[in-house]
């Protein structure tokens, strides 16, 4: 691969920072972008710009011609890539849960029970429970709310809701009408 920038051109452009930077950027930006992309940097374009912003003030101080310049540019690019990966490992990117992107193939026990039982059977099973237990299971399983949401609705703590749900499920497991649906 031939460089568009030669040692002679680099020497001739010393002192004219605008043209020198333009030539350096045109010569190396694509290579730096490719390097950062290959290394898995999440936003390689932004990091490429950061690399050249770090290189610009040091252009007059670089020795070794085009080879020394290339070494310096890729040293900066490597350091920025390492910094970016460290930053990502310390503060991972969070995404909201999107049910359409959920690729799990195993459904939950609650979902399987709902498929097996007709709505009237579910209501009959819930009659075995106390009012609070029935309300918790209805909100958690039928309405699909989180523990925190159920606690807020019922005016109880998260722990109380979890305990009510646990006791309700134990009560249901002990009834013969439920035993045919529940595997040991």
Language model segments and positions:
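N-terminal module of bacterial RNA polymerase sigma factors
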Residues: 1-30
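Internal acidic/polar
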Residues: 2, 83, 91-119
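Short, small-hydrophobic-rich alpha-helical interface motif
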Residues: 13-14, 28, 32, 44-55, ...
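Short, charged helix-capping/linker segments at alpha-helix termini
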Residues: 14-22, 33-50, 64, 158, ...
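Σ70-family region 2.3-2.4 aromatic/basic alpha-helix that recognizes the −10 promoter
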Residues: 29, 49-56, 66-87
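Arg/Lys-rich amphipathic alpha helix in sigma70-family domain 2
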Residues: 38, 60-64, 75-96, 115
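DNA-recognition helix of helix-turn-helix
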Residues: 78, 82, 142, 148, ...
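A short pre-motif secondary-structure segment
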Residues: 136-140
């Amino acid at each position: 691969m031939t460089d568009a920038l030669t040692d002679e051109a680099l020497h001739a452009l010393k002192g004219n920072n605008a043209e020198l930077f333009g030539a350096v950027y045109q010569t190396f930006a694509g290579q730096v972008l490719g390097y950062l992309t290959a290394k898995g940097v999440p936003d390689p374009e932004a990091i490429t710009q950061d690399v050249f912003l770090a290189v610009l003030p040091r252009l007059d101080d670089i020795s070794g011609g085009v080879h020394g310049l290339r070494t310096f540019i890729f040293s900066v690019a490597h350091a920025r890539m390492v910094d970016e990966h460290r930053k990502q490992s310390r503060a991972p990117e969070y995404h909201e849960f999107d049910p359409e992107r959920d690729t799990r193939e195993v459904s939950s026990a609650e979902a399987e029970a709902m498929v097996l039982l007709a709505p009237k059977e579910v209501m009959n099973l819930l009659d075995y429970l106390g009012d609070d237990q029935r309300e918790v299971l209805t909100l958690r399983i039928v309405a699909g709310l989180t523990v925190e949401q159920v606690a807020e609705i019922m005016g109880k703590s998260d722990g109380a809701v979890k305990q009510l749900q646990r006791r309700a499920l134990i009560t249901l497991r002990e009834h013969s009408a439920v035993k045919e649906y529940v595997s040991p």
